[in-house]
Amino acid sequence: MGTARFLSAVLLLSVLLMVTFPALLSAEYHDGRVDICSLPSDSGDCLRLFEMWYFDGTTCTKFVYGGYGGNDNRFPTEKACMKRCAKV
C-alpha cells in the first residue's frame, strides 16, 4: 500500500510540473517574482463552470474556470482584473 501511494504522489507531482512549467516559462518576472498578469489564461483541471476574468496583455477578458488548478491570472470580476493588471 505504501509503494502505491508513493507512486501516486510521484505521478501527481509529475503532472503538475508538466502543466505548470510551460506557463512559468512564458511569464514575465519582476524582482524575481512572476507577474501574474503575464500568465496565459488557464481553465484549470475540473469541469465546473465558473465565469472568471484574466488579463490578456491588453485588457481583461472573460473565460470559464473549471474550479481547480490553473494559475493566478484569474479574477472574479473585470474590475478586480483591471485594478491588478491594467497599466495606467
Curated annotation (Swiss-Prot):
Disulfide-bond pairs as recorded: C37-C85, C60-C81
Tissue expression as described in the entry: Expressed by the venom gland.
Site (Reactive bond for chymotrypsin) at: L47, R48
Domain BPTI/Kunitz inhibitor: from-to ranges: 37-85
A GO MF annotation of the entry reads: potassium channel regulator activity
Record site: May bind Kv1: L39
Q: Name one GO cellular component term.
A: extracellular region
Give the stretches traversing the membrane.
none
Cell location = Secreted
Q: Name one Pfam family in it.
A: Kunitz_BPTI
Keywords annotated in UniProt: Disulfide bond, Protease inhibitor, Secreted, Serine protease inhibitor, Signal
Please give the superkingdom of this protein's source: Eukaryota
- Any single GO BP term: envenomation resulting in negative regulation of voltage-gated potassium channel activity in another organism
Signal peptide segment: 1-27
Query: Which positions carry the propeptide annotation?
Result: 28-33
Keyword Disulfide bond among UniProt keywords? yes
Q: Which family does it belong to?
A: Belongs to the venom Kunitz-type family. 03 (sub-Kunitz) subfamily.
Question: What is the role of the protein in this entry?
Answer: Serine protease inhibitor that inhibits trypsin at a molar ratio of 1:1.
- The protein's name is Kunitz-type U15-theraphotoxin-Hs1f
Q: Which organism is it from?
A: Cyriopagopus schmidti (Chinese bird spider)
